[in-house]
Amino acid sequence: MNEETSMDEGEQEKIELIMGLRRQGIRDKRVLSALERVPREKFISATFRKQAYEDHALPIECGQTISQPYIVAYMTEQLHVGERMKVLEVGTGSGYQAAVLSRLCRRVYTIERYRTLLKDAVKRLEDLHIHNVTAKVGDGAQGWPEQAPFDRIIVTAAAPSVPQKLVDQLKEGGLMIVPVAVSGARGEQKLVRIERTGDGVKREELLPVRFVPLVEGVAKES
């Protein structure tokens, strides 16, 4: 009985979160449906599980975070992901963003610098029977050139500037969403959307954000 009540409460909290995202301007029904179909509580530790459907970031292992649901929804909506697209995610983290993307596109390739995080994320995706995500440990700043070009790229850590190696792995007409440090403004970041065109790139600044920094190389873990 208690378990059923807990499940009912979780579903109600999820519905309230989705309604809140709509009120904040998220309109893409496919994106909202994807978030509704991914159980966020599966991607966080038991300590914070009761906060799974509150609209804020939560800590995960290795000093990283699972992003605020609004930011996940906003970034995903701004990517305009199509069903047949191939998407690169830089920064697997808990695996939550990859799970959301998996509901929207043909295949997700995701890179994580922490082996511990990647192992746990892959297990969560397997438990949810998500089979269109390919993951590896690696340096996200280098992208995944063996699988390039990508229709879309999403970066879930803040870069000091737009990573050219990632831009180079976009298809022409492809989009990338990346948090970028604001030059001369300590600690400030802007979410930036990059479109690769035939003669260069178009850059559009979207909104202020706060992400953990994009760190080069594979993490050394004890």
Swiss-Prot record:
Gene3D superfamilies: Vaccinia Virus protein VP39. GO terms for biological process: methylation; protein modification process; protein repair. GO terms for cellular component: cytoplasm. The active site is at S67. The keyword Cell inner membrane does not apply. Keywords: Cytoplasm, Methyltransferase, S-adenosyl-L-methionine, Transferase. Signal peptide: none annotated. Its EC number is 2.1.1.77. GO terms for molecular function: protein-L-isoaspartate (D-aspartate) O-methyltransferase activity. It catalyses: [protein]-L-isoaspartate + S-adenosyl-L-methionine = [protein]-L-isoaspartate alpha-methyl ester + S-adenosyl-L-homocysteine. The keyword Transport does not apply. CDD domains: AdoMet_MTases (cd02440). HAMAP family: PIMT. Belongs to the methyltransferase superfamily. L-isoaspartyl/D-aspartyl protein methyltransferase family. Catalyzes the methyl esterification of L-isoaspartyl residues in peptides and proteins that result from spontaneous decomposition of normal L-aspartyl and L-asparaginyl residues. It plays a role in the repair and/or degradation of damaged proteins. This is Protein-L-isoaspartate O-methyltransferase.
